[in-house]
Amino acid sequence: MFDPFGDFATEGYLRNFDKEKDLEIVKIAEHELFRAQLPAALDFLAKRKQIEYADFLEVHRILFEGLYPWAGKDRAEVLPNSAVKKGALYFCHPRDCRLAVSEGWSVAHDKKLLDKRPGFIMGMFAYGHPFLDGNGRTMLLVHAELCFRTNMSVNWMRTSKQPYLDALTKEIQAPNDGHLDAYLKPFIAPQIPRDNWLQSVSDLPGLDGIDAESDVSAGYSDPAITKEYQEFERRRGYQLDNKRAH
């Protein structure tokens, strides 16, 4: 059980307002909240002249503030000294959440690149992993809006959950190799109206992203964790550009 706060026994899964410990119930609540708040989140994105990191956080808040007290707050604010990993895969250090997402913006805001590198963008969002839960839904909505503004879309209904998640995992591990770009290429399609997106998005495969409940949290104060994280970053072989944070 993912318990980064260390208080699951008294506060439930990720300190949800009901202190619910049954993960199946929590996930149902997440999904129903997402469906209910989806129009508001998409409307918010549609009105933004240029989407930035603060808007990424706001989408998460809109979707999940009815369930989690930390909704809309990233790991740098909530748990700045804790690593989040899944097996041998590490998400970025909390201090780099903004940098990682902004690295995705650097491609997303270039209309000549977005249709060629949609997987790179999604991979950077996933590596940034700003939130303790709800990353998959949040980044999917932001990614869809970015695609819309470039007169394109990803036909997510034609994708399959496990192959997508496998490609996403490889993308996080090796962002220079184009794993997710290659996976998504056959699914690139013309722009679709936002209303059509609204009707279908709640049932997309892989909506949760890489399942948060299987995450593990550990303090960077543990030398073994720090060493393992540094080794993962070395193998990953990608340097974030701190000039791009916005």
Identify the function of each model-found stretch:
Residues 1-133, 137-246:
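FIC/Doc superfamily catalytic core
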